[in-house]
């Protein structure tokens, strides 16, 4: 086994025992990244920074080193990293190198982590297939025949890199499923924490009331380790919660006897593939066998979640993206003689933003306009409150976690949705958006393969601030499923 194939927990133990050096581990990852170029997962490599950090980790070993000392990670291009290109996969931020470090990356580096580079993603995190990136498509390491498959989105580069063992873990962000859907498509673990658990400061904003950063890893234990380093109060983020961060790894007891797992009847979508239905049933059985009580529940406003999300998220995006105007940073269009400032804004935004971003900014501006604010935006906000209330009632009745499918299908081919109605692409988020609208924690766990040999995941949704309990349920599901399959190396 090559060092880059280790889990975070295995590497941590090997480093602590002196069986492995952080420099050797980092070199193994850099070699794998080099060989993994066809996956287009990494878009900005930082080998000098990585090796400097690895050497510092080796020097620190043993003297109260951090929880991630010497662990090489990939960072999604949405996180601002000081002096390193941070473009949110958009041409409008071409060449942008922040003079500051996001809170999440600061915390990871303080814990001893090593940054290998920045990872591909959908432009401004808007997409479910990593096909809206200015860097080109990231490619799923899993393959059927000779078709290249999507790794999902928006955190597609993060998912591909972890699944292909290019790094030991990665950061992702999740606004409507952007950690959980790619994790399911690539056979890895991805958790979106409770809104406010992880600081958003220094992360390029998409929809500020929905965005949340989280870890993408090979195992649930690794997710617990990485989330512990990422989480915590940050005075620089007004939505960051000032509550203690528990020891998530210690919570993985494997004991869920007597816990109540809710199965929402509204998630049985019309036309749901039989494989997804069977996987969901298998998940219920595995949790019941572990001693949990399975309870049918109702979340009556689920059917309104997708339309409400696709009003609220673009509305917030259109406001957040107004700051990209070619004046202070990023791309500025070449102007003709006589062009004024309005021409500069228009040309810069037309050249800098991709089609999907333009579409969402247009939708957002429309639903926030005077004539439609009440008809669309305010109505969507009311629906959001009802969706949150559904979850509150279920948890008040004693449900500990909710089990649902993570995605409506396994990974689809790159380019397959190119001529589809945009709404068809949006349907990929059907099982995940409710979690963001309600601000809850959700995790995707790989549970099996479909008939084509592609990974499928199940989603567990937890009570607010109970990531510890959620991770323990996920750990039990992971152990019962025994998913150890890896993609066959073709790159």
Curated annotation (Swiss-Prot):
- The enzyme's first-digit EC class, named in words, is ligase
Enzyme Commission no: 6.3.5.7
Reaction equation(s) it catalyzes:
L-glutamyl-tRNA(Gln) + L-glutamine + ATP + H2O = L-glutaminyl-tRNA(Gln) + L-glutamate + ADP + phosphate + H(+)
**Keywords, sorted A to Z:** ATP-binding, Ligase, Nucleotide-binding, Protein biosynthesis
GO BP annotations, alphabetical order = translation
What domain of life does the UniProt record list for this protein's source? Answer: Bacteria
Subunit text: Heterotrimer of A, B and C subunits.
Give the family from UniProt.
Answer: Belongs to the amidase family. GatA subfamily.
UniProt-listed PANTHER family: GLUTAMYL-TRNA(GLN) AMIDOTRANSFERASE SUBUNIT A (PTHR11895:SF151), TRANSAMIDASE (PTHR11895)
Q: What does this protein do?
A: Allows the formation of correctly charged Gln-tRNA(Gln) through the transamidation of misacylated Glu-tRNA(Gln) in organisms which lack glutaminyl-tRNA synthetase. The reaction takes place in the presence of glutamine and ATP through an activated gamma-phospho-Glu-tRNA(Gln).
- Give the protein name, as stated in the record: Glutamyl-tRNA(Gln) amidotransferase subunit A
What does the record give as the organism's lineage?
Answer: Bacteria, Pseudomonadati, Pseudomonadota, Alphaproteobacteria, Rhodobacterales
């Amino acid at each position: 086994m090559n060092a880059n194939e280790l889990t975070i927990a295995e590497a941590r133990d090997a480093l602590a025992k002196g069986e492995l050096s952080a420099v050797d581990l980092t070199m193994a990852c850099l070699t794998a990244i080099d060989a993994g170029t066809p996956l287009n997962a990494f878009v900005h490599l930082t080998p000098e920074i990585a090796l400097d950090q690895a050497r510092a980790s080796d020097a620190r070993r043993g003297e109260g080193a951090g929880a991630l000392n010497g662990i090489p990670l990939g960072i999604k291009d949405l996180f601002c990293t000081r002096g390193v290109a941070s473009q949110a996969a958009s041409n409008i931020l071409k060449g942008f190198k922040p003079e500051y470090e996001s809170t999440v990356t600061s915390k990871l580096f303080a814990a001893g982590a090593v940054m290998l580079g920045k990872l591909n993603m959908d432009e401004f995190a808007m997409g479910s297939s990593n096909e809206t990136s200015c860097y080109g498509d990231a490619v799923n390491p899993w393959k059927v025949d000779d078709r290249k498959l999507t790794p999902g989105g928006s955190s597609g580069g993060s998912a591909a890199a972890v699944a292909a063992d290019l790094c030991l873990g990665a950061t992702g962000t999740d606004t409507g499923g952007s950690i959980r859907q790619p994790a399911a498509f690539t056979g890895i673990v991805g958790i979106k924490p409770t809104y406010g658990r992880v600081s958003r400061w220094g992360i390029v904003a998409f929809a500020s009331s929905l965005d949340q950063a989280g870890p993408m890893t090979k195992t649930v234990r690794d997710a617990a380790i990485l989330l512990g380093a990422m989480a915590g109060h940050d005075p620089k983020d007004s939505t960051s919660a000032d509550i203690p961060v528990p020891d998530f790894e210690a919570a993985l007891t494997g004991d869920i006897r007597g816990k109540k797992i809710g199965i929402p009847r509204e998630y049985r979508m019309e036309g749901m593939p039989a494989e997804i239905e069977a996987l969901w049933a298998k998940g219920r059985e595995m949790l019941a066998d572990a001693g949990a009580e399975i309870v049918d529940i109702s979340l009556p406003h689920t059917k309104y979640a997708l339309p409400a999300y696709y009003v609220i998220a673009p509305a917030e995006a259109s406001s957040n993206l107004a700051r990209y105007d070619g004046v202070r940073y990023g791309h500025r269009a070449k102007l003709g003689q006589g062009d004024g400032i309005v021409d500069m804004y228009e040309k810069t935004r037309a050249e800098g933003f991709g089609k999907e971003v333009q579409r969402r900014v247009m939708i957002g501006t429309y639903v926030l306009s005077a004539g439609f604010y009440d008809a669309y935006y305010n109505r969507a906000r009311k629906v959001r409150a009802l969706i949150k209330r559904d979850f509150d009632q279920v948890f008040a009745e004693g449900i500990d976690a909710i089990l649902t499918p993570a995605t409506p299908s396994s990974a689809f081919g790159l380019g397959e949705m190119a001529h589809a109605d945009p709404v068809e692409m949006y349907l990929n988020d059907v099982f995940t958006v409710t979690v963001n609208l309600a601000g809850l924690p959700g995790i995707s766990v790989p549970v099996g393969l479909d008939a084509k040999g592609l990974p499928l995941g199940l989603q567990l949704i937890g009570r607010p601030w109970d990531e510890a309990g959620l991770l323990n349920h996920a750990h039990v599901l992971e152990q019962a499923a025994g998913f150890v399959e890896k993609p066959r190396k073709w790159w």
